[in-house]
């Protein structure tokens, strides 16, 4: 999952650009480190690990700092805190701020509004019950446009090589680099089991 988290920042954030990092736990704070590593300017909105984010405060910070993107974690692994995304995503969306959400610990275990998130990050472990080693991402068209407009200083941590890769085909697909194929088969099997049980039943348990 960490590769996906860093790749989202590396691909979307140009040096000097401001990113609002919402943090009420370890992984929320970690986003700020990635922003700094890639030359961005993090503005950290930090609250206690048991507290939710205040949408009004998020709006004020957006108005004050004009960030190109905002990062947050859906479920903080160490505490199990599940953040309510709806209001915060609404505020950020209305302001035109790109949203990056770490859903590594929640995707597959509880509903995640991926259609409202510009980059939603998951991983093969956690709720997918598959071996670790694969990052999963959904990327909006708006986010792809920002990737293409942002100078990419890395290949491995850039999303750009994945632009246009179509996995929904029976034809041979050339991927940007070699994957651990055994993990891909394992993830496919895990997803089949989740779908066979039914997502609503999975969410209930």
Language-model segment annotations:
Residues 6, 10, 32, 59, ...:
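Predominant activation on well-ordered alpha-helical scaffold segments within soluble catalytic domains
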Residues 21-64, 74-82:
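Gly/Ser-rich phosphate-binding catalytic loop and adjacent alpha/beta segment
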Residues 53-104, 108, 119:
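Active-site phosphate-binding strand-loop segment of PLP-dependent enzymes
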Residues 114-125:
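Conserved active-site segment immediately N-terminal to the catalytic lysine
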């Amino acid at each position: 999952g960490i590769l996906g988290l860093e790749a989202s920042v590396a691909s979307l954030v140009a040096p000097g650009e401001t990113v609002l990092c919402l943090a009420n736990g370890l992984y929320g704070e970690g986003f700020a480190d990635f922003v700094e590593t890639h030359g961005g300017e993090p503005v950290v909105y930090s609250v206690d690990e048991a507290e939710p984010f205040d949408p009004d405060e998020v709006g004020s910070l957006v108005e004050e700092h004009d960030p190109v993107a905002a990062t947050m974690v859906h479920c903080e692994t160490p505490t199990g805190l599940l953040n309510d995304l709806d209001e915060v995503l609404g505020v950020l969306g209305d302001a035109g701020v790109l949203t990056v959400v770490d859903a590594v610990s929640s995707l597959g275990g509880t509903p995640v509004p991926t259609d409202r998130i510009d980059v939603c990050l998951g991983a093969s472990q956690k709720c997918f019950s598959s071996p670790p080693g694969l990052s999963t991402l959904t990327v909006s068209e708006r986010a792809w446009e920002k990737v293409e407009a942002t100078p990419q200083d890395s290949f491995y941590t850039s999303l750009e090589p994945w632009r246009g890769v179509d996995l929904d085909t029976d034809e041979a697909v050339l991927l940007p680099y070699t994957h651990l194929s055994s993990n891909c088969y394992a993830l496919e099997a895990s997803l089949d089991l989740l779908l066979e049980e039914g997502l609503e039943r999975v969410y209930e348990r």
